[in-house]
């Protein structure tokens, strides 16, 4: 039988660990997932990414449920992955989700970014997301009366 984590604690993001981002992949290969105004300006996109990560880490220190576990079939067994909300335009709502996994006991690595639709699909494979930012309607435009 497959084993996806060693302990239940592996499913909770450890805020005491350092987070290192794969900027070249996130901004090089996935810039098309960013809001349009940031796609044309990689310098602003990186600044927005750094700011959004800092915001998410502050929120996670107050509420561990902000970072949601995900399951990705291609990830190595025994590796927990997480989805961290990224509010890139500072409007209080997530625009993308950062995929994070442990590189070692003290470091997490931010691998890539997913659209909210992609993130919701991956998160619900573990359990129903218990989060205020990752909802079934994530990413859908608001209805206009």
Residue ranges and their predicted role:
Residues 1-77:
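An acidic, glycine-rich, mixed-charge low-complexity segment common to nucleic-acid enzymes
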Residues 79-144:
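Compact beta-sheet-dominated globular domain cores
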């Amino acid at each position: 039988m497959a084993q996806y984590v060693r302990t239940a604690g592996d499913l909770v993001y450890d805020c005491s660990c350092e987070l290192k981002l794969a900027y070249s992949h996130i901004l090089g290969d996935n810039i098309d997932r960013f809001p349009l105004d940031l796609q044309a300006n990689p310098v602003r996109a990186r600044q927005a990414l750094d700011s959004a990560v800092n915001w998410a880490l502050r929120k996670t220190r107050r509420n561990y449920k902000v970072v949601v576990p995900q399951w990705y079939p291609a990830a190595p067994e025994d590796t927990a992955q997480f989805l961290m909300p990224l509010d890139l335009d500072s409007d209080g709502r997530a625009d993308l989700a950062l995929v994070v996994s442990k590189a070692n006991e003290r470091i997490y690595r931010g691998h890539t970014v997913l659209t909210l639709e992609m993130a919701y699909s991956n998160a619900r494979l573990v359990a129903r997301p218990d989060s205020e930012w990752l909802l079934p309607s994530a990413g859908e435009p608001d209805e206009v009366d």
